[in-house]
Amino acid sequence: MNTGGILSPHDAWLMIRGLRTLPLRLKQSTASTHWLLEQLEKHPKVERIHYPLHPSHPQFKLAQKQMTGAGGLFSLTLKVHTPEEIDKFCNALQHFLIACSWGGHESLVFPVAGLCDSANYSTSPHPWNMVRFYIGLEEKEYLLHDIEQALTQLK
């Protein structure tokens, strides 16, 4: 007889503990994301912002009707010429960890070019010059400074 997996009492307590602060964490992450995108939208190295509640998104009006928030996950398409520049940008970030699990308290980054080899860049459903971010609970000015200093590393 298999009754399926169950949580241990300690794991259940940890989950309940985390769920109690989830609305506050999402509110902070979303607010920081909106502020950061306002600061980055006019940066000369940012080609496009991919975030459903950003006015430049093709389905912005629909997102406004259906969503009360979009969280801290967004993508930037950068004005660069080579995948190596994307690597240089991501490596220059000092306060973002390379993403392995979205949704925690720390800010994360993931270069989309890491998903496929260079021979398949043209057939990838996502542009190779796209970088995905998750904004955690750090101070937004601190994160903006980090992104801006990494953008200065680009040609």
Show which residues each predicted segment covers.
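Active-site C-terminal subdomain of aminotransferase-like
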Residues: 1-73, 77-81, 85-108, 113
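PLP-dependent enzyme catalytic core of the Aspartate aminotransferase-like
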Residues: 25, 107-155
